[in-house]
Amino acid sequence: MQEYRLVLVTGPSGAGRTTAINALEDMGYEVIDNLPLSFVPRLIEGPSIGRPIALGLDVRNRDFNATALIELIDRLTQDPRVALEVLYVDCSASELIRRYNQTRRRHPLAPAETPAEGVEREIDLLAPVRVRADHLIDTSEMSPHDLKAELSRWFDRGAATRLAVSVQSFSYKRGVPRGVDMIFDCRFLKNPYWVESLRALDGREASVADYISSDPRFAPFFEKLRDLVLFLLPAQLEEGKAHLSLGFGCTGGQHRSVAVAELLGNALAEAGWPVSKRHRELERRAAAVLPTHQGEKA
């Protein structure tokens, strides 16, 4: 009988591991950060504390090394009393370097060198651990709020048990978002950008959505899109997925993709599915007018 639910949280410094640990604590986990690896087995020697445990482990641990951590994962996986999950909070090297340069912090593996050298060294060190993760989350384009919301869908046992859906709009000129399961190209729809009265608005405005909906191709497209997604969601849930991410792209990420993402998100919510909506380019545009210190990353 499994008595302990244990989540090991690791990943490169600056990726958002501390944010993840704090989020798990808010969900009711008993959190222990930077515990030496050799002490971890002692946690399961006594009686269960009755709630799940989250352990934060990274290169700052006194006895940390990838081989020892993998051996610990193997040992805990084989223990019939333990339900183990490994969460790896990841981030691209370029974004990690940007975060270090922005905060002017020294990297723990390169205190006397550039952040880039420390980041590269740590990514190489953690590579064997990364492939053992049960959950991999890339925070390169996430805010702390985004990360907490994603973890809540994965680990909060008090949250809805149905598959959660996220829809997001984006601009193809700025690249396809990371971690999207399905992408739909909305550039075939007529573009409100060329209507002077609509150009400065975005797809959340009724006038923009009405203009896009007036395209003869919109109604059959949206009907088929909605039916396809509603057909797929139960199948994805049966396969054990907890989350499905849908991306909608157009040229500028302001009108067509935003409108379609909004309309589909509303349709899925009306059908009873938990839905979150994000509009990447609109967020970037809003962030550009804020002071630099408010642009916090995970």
Swiss-Prot record:
Xref: Pfam families: PapZ_C, RapZ-like_N
Binding site for GTP: 58-61
Entry GO MF terms: ATP binding; GTP binding
Keyword GTP-binding among UniProt keywords: yes
Taxonomic superkingdom: Bacteria
Keywords linked to the UniProt accession: ATP-binding, GTP-binding, Nucleotide-binding
Positions annotated to bind ATP: 11-18
Database matches in SUPFAM superfamilies: P-loop containing nucleoside triphosphate hydrolases
Function of the molecule: Displays ATPase and GTPase activities.
PANTHER family: RNASE ADAPTER PROTEIN RAPZ
Membership in a protein family: Belongs to the RapZ-like family.
Protein's name in the database: Nucleotide-binding protein RSKD131_3085
Organism for this UniProt entry: Cereibacter sphaeroides (strain KD131 / KCTC 12085)
Phylogenetic lineage: Bacteria, Pseudomonadati, Pseudomonadota, Alphaproteobacteria, Rhodobacterales
